[in-house]
């Protein structure tokens, strides 16, 4: 398992739309350069890892929209100025979040199971703990190809940065700090 971190503001180039298939070119026209740059970086990295041409790679999508590419499992996350591309030889999910003031207790009560709530509400830095738990929950649902609305299906216990999954056939989860002011987590099958 490995992941690459990019500072999006440092990626100052015009994307090569010829590396993208027509559907992604149309999406880039709607969403802008940042989308095109992210997709170009992803396709170039997949090409480096597989030897395939970036424009010829055909992704499939899970019922909840997770992009899949069987020759090289991957996942993408971006927040604010941070982009993370994660790769593994089996299923993988990644999430990065920029920490910012928000009503995290309300979000936590809506999306987290009791074991997760206990893990961050009893600690001294609830904002950091919340974002760590949130990233772990997102990484787990993305690993499964599911949606955050189903996060309670993937319970875990949180203890000082350590994630212990509480369900059968659970993946490994590692937390990390991709850059100052950001938190990340990656879930991957061993």
Annotate each PLM feature.
Residues 1-190:
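Core catalytic alpha/beta fold that binds nucleotide/phospho-ligands
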């Amino acid at each position: 398992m490995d992941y690459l971190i990019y500072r999006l503001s440092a990626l100052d180039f015009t994307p090569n739309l010829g590396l993208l298939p027509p559907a992604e070119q149309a999406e880039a026209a709607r969403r802008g350069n940042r989308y095109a740059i992210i997709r170009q970086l992803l396709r170039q990295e997949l090409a480096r890892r597989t030897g395939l041409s970036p424009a010829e790679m055909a992704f499939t999508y899970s019922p909840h929209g997770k992009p899949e590419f069987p020759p090289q499992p991957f996942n993408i996350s971006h927040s604010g100025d941070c982009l993370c591309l994660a790769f593994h030889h089996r299923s993988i999910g990644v999430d990065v979040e920029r920490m910012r003031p928000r009503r995290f207790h309300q979000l936590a009560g809506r999306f987290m199971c009791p074991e997760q709530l206990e893990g961050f509400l009893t600690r001294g830095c609830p904002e950091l703990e919340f974002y760590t738990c949130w990233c772990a929950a997102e990484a787990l649902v993305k690993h499964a190809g599911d949606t955050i609305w189903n996060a309670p299906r993937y319970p875990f216990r949180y203890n000082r940065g350590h994630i212990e999954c509480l369900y059968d056939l659970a993946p490994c989860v590692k937390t990390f700090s991709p850059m100052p002011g950001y938190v990340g987590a990656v879930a991957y099958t061993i």
